[in-house]
């Protein structure tokens, strides 16, 4: 066991050194280039923005993922440690790999390991997000343009600086929410709180409650996403009209507002289901929102465009 741990630690150290060398190489190349141009101030501004963005995203992502895992451990029952459960693929005749996974799960899913996973995943997410340093600086340092769009009355600076940052933030929120939900579902499954096999289909009340809360946050983020999509109509280009067309204003915009209202109602219902703890209600809400946004809305827009 000690030898295995030493091997893992050695691999981690080597990987960290390789990553560090790569970052140091990029740092020196950029520093040399900016120094040759006489713009070291710009270089340090970019570095500071990347560090601040990394720290903010890292902390927020780690807390969000860890909180989901910690809550799942707390509400997954009275068992101090997860136990293996029967797996649906064992009836497929290939039991070697699933058997190994089934034996490893109780030992892998520990509170400390979940915290470590949260930190590692958050580090990767934050590192990827440092590429958005320009969006962060543009949002922070924006100034009014002095002219407004005729449809929503927003200053042009909103579309140049705020909207791109909001869209990126929305994507991060959905991604982190999905990671947290995946970790919580894995813990509930390993603890026997979720089971789908030939003998039984079972989801515990605790899993339903936490899943409903996460789904409520998902619908809330989607409501905000549809609000942002209203402004993206001004970026439209159908080959004839650049900007919001007649169909966008009279069909797409009302549909987006209806989707915002639908997602808000679905979010409230999902949060309420944390006490009701019904399995069918979240599935019905998810099917309703996805069906409306991906099927009914495009069909309605297409029918209106064809009738003109």
Predicted feature residues:
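Active-site cores that bind ATP or allylic diphosphates and position pyrophosphate for catalysis
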Residues: 160
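Glycine-rich, often proline-containing surface loops adjacent to acidic residues and nearby aromatics
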Residues: 157
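Contiguous transmembrane helix-bundle modules in multi-pass membrane proteins
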Residues: 1-32, 39-154, 163, 167-308
């Amino acid at each position: 066991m000690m030898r295995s741990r030493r091997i893992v630690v050695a691999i981690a150290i080597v990987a960290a050194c390789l990553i560090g060398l790569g970052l140091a190489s990029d740092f020196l190349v950029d520093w040399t280039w900016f120094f040759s141009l006489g713009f070291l101030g710009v270089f340090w501004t970019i570095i500071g923005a990347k560090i601040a963005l990394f720290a903010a995203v890292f902390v927020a992502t780690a807390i969000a993922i860890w909180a989901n895992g910690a809550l799942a451990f707390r509400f997954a029952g009275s068992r101090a440690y997860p136990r293996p459960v029967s797996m649906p693929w064992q009836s497929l005749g290939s039991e070697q790999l699933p058997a190994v996974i089934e034996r490893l799960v109780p030992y892998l899913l520990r509170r400390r390991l979940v915290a470590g996973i949260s930190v590692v995943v958050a580090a990767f997410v934050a590192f990827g997000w440092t590429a958005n340093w320009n969006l962060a600086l543009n949002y922070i340092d924006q100034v009014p343009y002095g002219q407004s769009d005729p449809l929503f009355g927003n200053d042009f600076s909103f579309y140049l600086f705020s909207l791109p940052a909001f869209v990126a933030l929305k994507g991060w929120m959905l991604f982190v929410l999905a990671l947290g939900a995946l970790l919580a579902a894995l813990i509930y499954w390993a603890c026997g709180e979720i089971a789908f096999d030939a003998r039984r289909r079972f989801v515990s009340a605790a899993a339903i409650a936490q899943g409903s809360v996460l789904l409520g946050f998902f619908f809330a983020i989607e409501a905000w996403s549809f609000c942002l999509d209203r402004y993206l109509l001004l970026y439209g280009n159908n080959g004839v009209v650049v900007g919001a067309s007649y169909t966008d204003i009279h069909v797409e915009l009302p549909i987006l507002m209806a989707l915002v209202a639908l997602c808000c109602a679905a979010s409230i219902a999902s949060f309420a289901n944390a006490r009701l703890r019904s399995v069918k209600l979240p599935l019905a809400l998810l099917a309703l929102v996805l069906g409306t946004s991906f099927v009914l809305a495009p069909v309605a827009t297409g029918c209106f465009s064809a009738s003109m």
